Design a protein with these regions (language model features):
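Short, solvent-exposed alpha-helical surface patches in non-cytosolic proteins
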Residues: 42-48
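Structured surface interface patches that mediate subunit assembly and partner/cofactor docking
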Residues: 2-20, 24-40, 54-76, 82-204
Length: 204
């Protein structure tokens, strides 16, 4: 089978998810993050910003000793939105240049296809946007992003859950829309709190 690059429309999904998280970063980062027990709001922001650097490093199989600093640095600083775009640029380029969506990337927990790494990054951006600022999900674009994730991210999310980096999935009400189903998949109640006090999304 011939190699298949990531479709342009999937890169567009990544760009839209990045913009969504940027809107969440425009809110105050002080205080605790109720949806991620044990994390502050700044911890949540820094996890996502550092994740952009870590995901890019997986393409070149960088050792943990070279990327460990990204887990503790204050990437957000005083200008979190510009920091998001700066820390996301390298991964965006790697994904755009990836020759095959099925090629395996050595994620820290398991080898996964490039397409799943993309889906996991979009999942991280969209779900943590809700953790920081639930009102960002009122944006018309979020329903489409949630539907895309329900279709493309479910398998890799369940793989991450097997490593105990996500809380248990929530029950899905009958007739639930895409956003509600995505919150349930992520282990969150519609209010944004973790189901049963589960783990934050620490999949990167």
């Amino acid at each position: 089978m011939s190699p298949t690059p990531i479709p342009r429309e999937h890169l567009d999904v990544l760009d839209r998810a990045t913009s969504l998280f940027g809107r969440a970063l425009a809110t105050d980062l002080d205080g605790d993050c109720a949806a991620c027990p044990g994390w502050t709001r700044r911890d949540c922001a820094n996890h996502v910003l550092g994740g952009g650097l870590r995901y890019a490093a997986y393409f070149t199989n960088e050792p943990e000793s070279e990327i460990g600093w990204t887990r503790t640095a204050d990437h957000a600083g005083d200008k979190p939105v510009p920091a998001l775009h700066r820390t996301s640029a390298g991964l965006r380029k790697r994904l755009a240049k990836a020759p095959d969506t099925e090629a395996l990337v050595p994620h820290r927990l398991a080898e996964i296809p490039v397409r799943d790494l993309l889906a996991l990054r979009v999942f991280e951006l969209v779900v943590h946007a809700h953790d920081l600022a639930p009102e960002t999900w009122d944006h018309p674009d979020t329903a489409d992003l949630a539907a895309w994730l329900n279709e493309h991210a479910r398998d890799v999310v369940e793989l991450m859950r097997a490593f105990d980096v996500l809380g248990q999935a929530g029950a899905v009400p009958l007739g639930a829309d895409a956003r509600t189903r995505l919150l349930a998949l992520s282990g969150r109640e519609p209010t944004g709190t973790a189901v049963g006090g589960g783990n934050p999304t620490s999949s990167s």
